[in-house]
Amino acid sequence: MLKYDVIVIGGGHAGVEAAAASARLGASTLLITLKPENLGEMSCNPAIGGIAKGTLVKEIDALDGLMGYVIDQGGIHYKMLNETRGPAVWGPRAQADRKLYKKAMCQILTNYPNLDILYGKVEDIEIKSSKVEAVILNNDSKILCQKIILTTGTFLSGLIHIGQKKIPAGRVDEEPSYGLSNTLKKVGFKIARLKTGTPPRIDGRTIDYSKTALQPGDKTPRPFSELTSVVNVPQINCFITKTTSETHDIIRENLNKSAMYSGQIEGIGPRYCPSIEDKIVRFSTKSEHRIFLEPEGLDDYTIYPNGISTSLPEDVQHKLIKTIPGLENVKVLRPGYAIEYDYVDPREISVTLETKKIAGLYFAGQINGTTGYEEAAGQGIIAGINAALAVKDQAPFMLTRANSYIGVMIDDLTTFGTIEPYRMFTSRSEYRLSLRADNADLRLTELGINIGVVSEKRKKIFTKKCEDIEKTKLLLNTLSLTTSKLAKMGIQVAQDGTYKTVLDLFKIPSFNVEQAIKIFPMLKEMQNNNILQLLYIEAKYASYLTRQHADINLFQSEEAQLIPKNIDYFKIPSISLEIQEKLSSHKPTTIGVARRISGITPAAITAIIIYLKTKYSDGSST
């Protein structure tokens, strides 16, 4: 009988990262997915990254994950979002050629050390004494294992809706999984329904682009991965159009036919990625909504109209599309649809992503209530790392709110749960100025090296970058001019007769990297390696970063204050019954987690700390 250390069920964005991370740590790993085409499949929009999401991709890359490198092999339209705003909210994004992305992912995984891939369907999980033992395939064969990672996406009791039509499916033309859903229910997991949707696909050859606005990408694509020196994929343009009052009228007239508004769907959809029906109802005063026409590939005429996700009947979809400028004569290749699926309350998992009920069972991706490729991949890499570390009886790997967006996401999910699809935003992070896309490797790669999940190749690249940063910093502290000379160049500085280094100049609000290069031309050769930009940001926001680091230190001290598993909150007399019940239900593991629970007062936190000091003065936390 076959036996593996770790089995990953599902080959989507969470699954591939989980499998690869587990394999990198030396665990014998099996990835089970329905068919080869599912590896890295982009079920919805053909793009990676965006605001906050781009930072997640960079963090995955920092831990030697796949997503950043793979998009660099298939990215056809790179754009830094929010670049006119502060660096804390910059969002690297790349449009993908679906075929190139999947091809690159498949090539990497099929040659990955310690990783086998099985194309088949898992029907059930064998559990004994609250611990995983094996997976059971739909042909009744059994594969033994120590750990299982479930990355089922929208396949758990998946149901597609197009108008009044219902189609049991995990994705178009793919069967859902009922066996796994039933098993999770039997075990006692809290299961609910969520919904997501996708727009119709249209034929780019039938679009009148003269009625649309051009959306060019960045002149020079900035790679996602530290392993990529330059993006060699041809770059293309996207286009923008918009809905009209006629579009809105058609949608309003047919709302009763929408699966969303007829009461047919019980699952809650993503708040920040609403269907076009939702937009018309929720933002009724808006006369138009933008639609981004995104090509799905270099040699593919399919266009993804980002912004009109819908579950209206096919005939209504055809009507509303014809009212959009440039799409009057467009051919619809595939209708849009909504899909409803099961998910598990993420408070059922710990920060390692292992379930609390079943030892050795991990969840990652949409099963935890998230939406988005990047959110799924971020969970996948953490689940894969922790499953492999557990096999080797090593300490778990936990990211926190203080060092990563991945940590913020996992903390949000495991502390608060979610009743709607969770999407990452910069606003969710209290330390976003410190947790930027440009410094993800400096925050996380060394942590990855310490546990052995980072390859030698990446380790060498990272070590050299750190050395180059120190050399560049030294140079920027050496290059200087007098204040009088700077004034003659039109740079406003206090005339105190001192010398100002480049790092000093970077702190001037109106001063930028381009000016520094103009004054010191030798800096131009450093412009392309991103180090100059990194040091510019660090200098520009030095005072803010210093304050934020103090906040982070306070946060970390509270995270280090463990709360014993056997604590009885009802024995702490100075806190209310409501708070005692809330703490008993949430079971926070640290003072930091307890503080973040809604309704827990500062006075209650103080009472807990005092109680711990008196009751557990010996340092016991069992």
From Swiss-Prot:
Q: For this protein, what is any one GO molecular function term?
A: flavin adenine dinucleotide binding
Recite the UniProt keywords alphabetically: Cytoplasm, FAD, Flavoprotein, NAD, tRNA processing
**GO biological process annotation, one example:** tRNA wobble uridine modification
Give the residues the record marks as binding NAD(+): 269-283
Tell me where on the tree of life, at the top rank, the source sits.
Bacteria
* Cellular component terms (Gene Ontology): cytosol
- Residues where FAD binds: G10, G11, G12, H13, A14, G15, V122, S177, Q366
Q: Could you tell me which SUPFAM superfamilies the record lists for this protein?
A: FAD/NAD(P)-binding domain
Q: Which InterPro entries match?
A: FAD/NAD-bd_sf, GIDA_C_N, MnmG, MnmG-rel, MnmG-rel_CS, MnmG_C, MnmG_C_subdom, MnmG_C_subdom_sf
Could you say which cofactors this protein requires?
Answer: FAD
Q: What protein family is recorded?
A: Belongs to the MnmG family.
Q: What's the subunit arrangement here?
A: Homodimer. Heterotetramer of two MnmE and two MnmG subunits.
Q: This chain belongs to which protein, by name?
A: tRNA uridine 5-carboxymethylaminomethyl modification enzyme MnmG
